[in-house]
């Protein structure tokens, strides 16, 4: 079985990075027309910048508003919009589900994808995977695409203005990366490319956990007292949530933490919680299933409580024991 490292073609992160979007795309040989699948908040925040940078590069673009759910119906709507404008590249802008939709549309059309996350709430931006849900928000399946994004462009100034809870959710998603990678390594499970992780993939996954421990609380403090330039700690957490976790989970694999997340989506009570919040809970459950050393469980528990991630059923909305029972069915 081959060792496989999986990553985006190019990753670019920094303050006001959106100003360089068209330049980065041209440098990769990407040309218009461009179809931007954008969440409402991303469009509100970035449309004026897109207009400026694409005009300067002589690239036509259209914006397709994202409905809020990465469903088969939404992917079909996005594909129709992209085909109608003759798009040669898809840009997904917004949160994880908008980016998942953008990658799915690009894969169906056989054209490159660019991801521009406006929040650091998941490790979705760098991946070649789309999590598909029903229109009502129930998890259905994963789509595995032939190619990772050609470009992931992360504007840390935009992310620093996002709600703090979304960064915390991203840390919850990133938290699982090392522990799921380790579980896959121990069991010999295959990664998303039908191989096993390289040493580099495992090292990146472990580094993700170390950065969360070192910088998580400081990054939250920085978001609560914003400055003109995002702090070094916040930049490191954005990178951990987005790049390190993205490479780690695709290169090393997923385990119980994400499976538990998927099961939780059947309970309506948890729909108000973000992906990473549920994954963090699943990570603790995975460590219990593995009978991990108590000091490791305590370290993860302490991290979760220090940044505000849920650690009990009640904290993910399951106050009624009957709701917990449904998860076994």
What are the residue ranges of the model-derived segments?
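A glycine/threonine-rich phosphate-anchoring loop and its flanking beta-alpha core
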Residues: 108-200
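Fold-independent oxyanion-binding glycine-rich loops
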Residues: 15-16, 38-40, 93-95, 116-119, ...
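Active-site segments that bind and position negatively charged phosphate/pyrophosphate groups
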Residues: 192-303
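A short, small-residue-rich loop immediately preceding and capping a beta-strand
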Residues: 82-105, 109-118
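ATP/NTP phosphate-donor binding region
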Residues: 1-89, 313
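C-terminal charged capping/lid subdomain of soluble metabolic enzymes
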Residues: 20, 292-329
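Short glycine/serine/threonine-rich phosphate/pyrophosphate-binding segments
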Residues: 18-21, 43-47, 72, 97-104, ...
């Amino acid at each position: 079985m081959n060792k496989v490292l999986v990553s985006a073609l190019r990753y670019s992160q920094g303050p006001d990075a959106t100003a360089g979007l068209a330049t980065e795309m041209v440098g990769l040989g990407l040309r218009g027309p461009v179809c931007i699948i954008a969440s409402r908040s991303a469009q509100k925040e970035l449309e004026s910048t897109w207009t400026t940078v694409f005009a300067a590069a002589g690239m036509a673009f259209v914006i397709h508003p994202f409905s809020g759910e990465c469903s088969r119906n939404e992917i079909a709507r996005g594909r129709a919009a992209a085909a109608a404008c003759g798009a040669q590249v898809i840009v997904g802008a917004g949160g994880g589900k908008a980016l998942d939709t953008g990658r799915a549309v690009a894969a169906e059309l056989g054209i490159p994808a660019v991801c521009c996350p406006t929040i650091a709430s998941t490790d979705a931006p760098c991946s070649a995977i789309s999590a598909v849900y029903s229109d009502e928000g129930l998890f259905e399946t994963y789509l595995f695409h032939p190619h990772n994004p050609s470009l992931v462009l992360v504007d840390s100034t935009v992310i620093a203005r996002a709600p703090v809870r979304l960064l915390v959710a991203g840390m919850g998603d990133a938290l699982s990366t090392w522990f799921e990678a380790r579980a896959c390594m121990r069991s010999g499970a295959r990664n998303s490319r039908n191989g096993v992780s390289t040493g580099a993939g495992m090292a990146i996954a472990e580094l993700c956990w170390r950065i969360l421990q070192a910088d998580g609380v400081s990054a939250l403090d920085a978001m609560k007292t914003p400055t003109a330039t995002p702090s070094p700690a916040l930049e490191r957490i954005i990178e951990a949530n987005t790049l390190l976790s993205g490479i780690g989970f695709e290169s090393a694999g997923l385990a119980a933490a994400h499976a538990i997340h998927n099961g939780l989506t059947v309970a309506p009570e948890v729909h108000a919680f973000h992906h990473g919040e549920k994954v963090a809970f699943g990570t603790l459950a995975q460590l219990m299933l593995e009978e991990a050393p108590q000091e490791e469980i305590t370290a993860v528990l302490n991290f979760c409580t220090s940044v505000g991630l849920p650690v009990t059923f009640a904290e993910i909305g399951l106050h009624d024991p009957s709701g917990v029972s449904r998860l076994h069915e």
